[in-house]
Amino acid sequence: TDQQATDELLGRLTTQRLKAGPGAYSVYSNDCFTLAELVVEAVSGQDLMDYVRERFLLPAGLEDTYAPGDAFDTSRLTKTYFSASDDRALPQDTVGIVGAGGLYATAEDLAAFGGLFCGENELLTDASWTSTGEELYAQGLWPADSRDDALAYGLGWDNVHMFPFGQSGIAAWVKGGDTLRYHAGLIVLPEAGKAVAVLSSGGLSTY
């Protein structure tokens, strides 16, 4: 993790006040994931990636997921370009804040991760499974008619009733992520036992 980035975040937070009490309403912020990273490291005494690998990746058999600082074959990373008319590859796209999404993974690993939310496994308790799909977006300030909104937060999810699945009563949990050049979309249908992941070097995670 980029220590300078986390230090700057903590420095900014020392001069700010909460806009509302914790849990009063639901918002998305990468800073929250970075803070979660720091909490995990402080409580566990481990680097976040070591903790994630030990507690999640290895038990789940996910062997193709890496942090930027890991030793892996970077030539496997998809090359990116400024435009279709310029064949010069850009430098490796890297996010140094691991908690905010600075991971590399194959689509297979990402889909398998989504599969952890489909059915019973040893990594998620029933309580954790239930809480991750709760409609947290409905807490506090949120339009009453929001069933088809692109954002409808769950615990860590961008949307927990994605259109058009929600219209048919099918639970659909969605998470997208973007760096400057890489984009990822994960859709999980927990009750149907299905997960799909799409990775790209163009477009956005939302389309």
Kindly give the residue locations of the regions a language model identified.
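Short, surface-exposed loop or secondary-structure junction motifs
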Residues: 1-180, 184-185
